[in-house]
């Protein structure tokens, strides 16, 4: 019997990419996106529409910089979904949860103390007047009611929890494409149909799947797919 080295499944293989080129590419993306995030946060009055040129200027700046958060999710997916080639899952959790969890907790604690001590010195902080306490902090921390701009931390932790599972299937290009199509249909397609007048009652029971309704997951997977297979 003749031996053969041909693979059993003829799956498309990831395209080789030079590491130095990847690092420069990622650095540029992160730097540009950081500036874009600052721009987004300095034009927040855009969410209070007014018929003025100043509001139109802020709207234009928001439109130019809105790519920042999707890029951060894509870069995270590009860097993390192949972590098994570098270290075990225990190291992944220890590195990622410690780094993000520490920043999230300390940042929330600092904001909570500042808002409670100076409730009338920060926009929207009046609700913190006279409520300082451990229980109140825990409740607000668990529900992202301290500094709502920290929503990114909550989203990225969700993706970290999914990463060990996703990392087992991302080496199969067809599986990644299936996940991308499914997540895009649920997280983007369904809300879009509602904008065009479709009553959500007709699709929510059948297609309201929390796992695939996350736009963050869509960008997370897309980052790995674009980097690896394009």
Question: What are the roles of these predicted feature ranges?
Answer:
Residues 69-82, 154-167, 194-230:
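Specific transmembrane alpha-helix
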């Amino acid at each position: 019997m003749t031996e053969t080295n041909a693979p059993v499944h003829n799956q498309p293989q990831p395209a080789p990419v030079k590491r130095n080129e990847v690092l420069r590419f990622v650095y540029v993306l992160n730097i540009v996106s950081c500036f874009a995030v600052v721009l987004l946060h300095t034009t927040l009055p855009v969410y209070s529409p007014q018929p003025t040129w100043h509001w139109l200027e802020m709207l234009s700046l928001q439109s130019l910089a809105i790519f920042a958060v999707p890029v951060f999710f894509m870069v995270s997916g590009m860097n993390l979904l192949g972590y098994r080639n570098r270290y075990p899952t225990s190291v992944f959790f220890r590195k990622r949860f410690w780094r993000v969890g520490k920043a999230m907790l300390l940042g929330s604690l600092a904001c909570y103390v500042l808002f409670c001590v100076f409730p009338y010195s920060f926009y929207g902080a009046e609700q913190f007047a006279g409520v300082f306490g451990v229980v109140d902090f825990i409740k607000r921390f668990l529900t992202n009611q301290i500094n709502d701009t920290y929503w990114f931390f909550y989203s990225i932790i969700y993706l970290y929890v999914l990463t060990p599972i996703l990392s087992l299937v991302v080496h199969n290009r067809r599986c990644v494409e299936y996940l991308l199509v499914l997540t895009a249909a649920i997280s983007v397609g369904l809300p879009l149909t509602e904008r065009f007048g479709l009553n959500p009652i007709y699709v929510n029971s059948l297609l309201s799947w929390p796992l695939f309704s996350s736009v963050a997951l869509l960008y997370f997977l897309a980052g790995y797919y674009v980097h690896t297979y394009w």
